[in-house]
């Protein structure tokens, strides 16, 4: 290779941009900081397992749903324990109803599901408060009266009677035998 005239040295022009330090074996004053550096463990992920448990989502608690379905099976409404509607399910049979009929049917079934859920609140409160207070028969009667009258929660029997009445009057179906069998 021929060197251009005036280029007598053995290095290229880009050597001026090499800012790296020359490799030396001399100890640097910064080497003393190595004594204070955190020790790297072989199981680095194991140290973080405790933090993962804090950030992982727990399984969502399974909510108890209270569902009522009309006798035709065209409308089902599921509510949460507080009476809020969680899910409305319609089958193909609902297509034969007009919009107004369907809205009315959903409303009626949702009200029954709400009563069923609120009756569960009644049972929950009477059982749990009764356990906490160890009430006698008179105290239990007062507690049931308080929960029923003050909180306006129906008993499970009242909710079942309301469902039987609606089904008997609205659909000409006798469901009283169904509720007597549960006794």
Swiss-Prot record:
Outcome of gene disruption: Inactivation does not abolish EsxA (ESAT-6) secretion, EsxA-specific immunogenicity and enhanced virulence.
Biased composition (Acidic residues): 1-16
Region (Disordered) location: 1-32
GO-annotated biological processes: response to antibiotic; symbiont-mediated perturbation of host innate immune response
Gene Ontology cellular component list: plasma membrane
Record protein name field: ESX-1 secretion-associated protein EspH
Organism: Mycobacterium tuberculosis (strain ATCC 25618 / H37Rv)
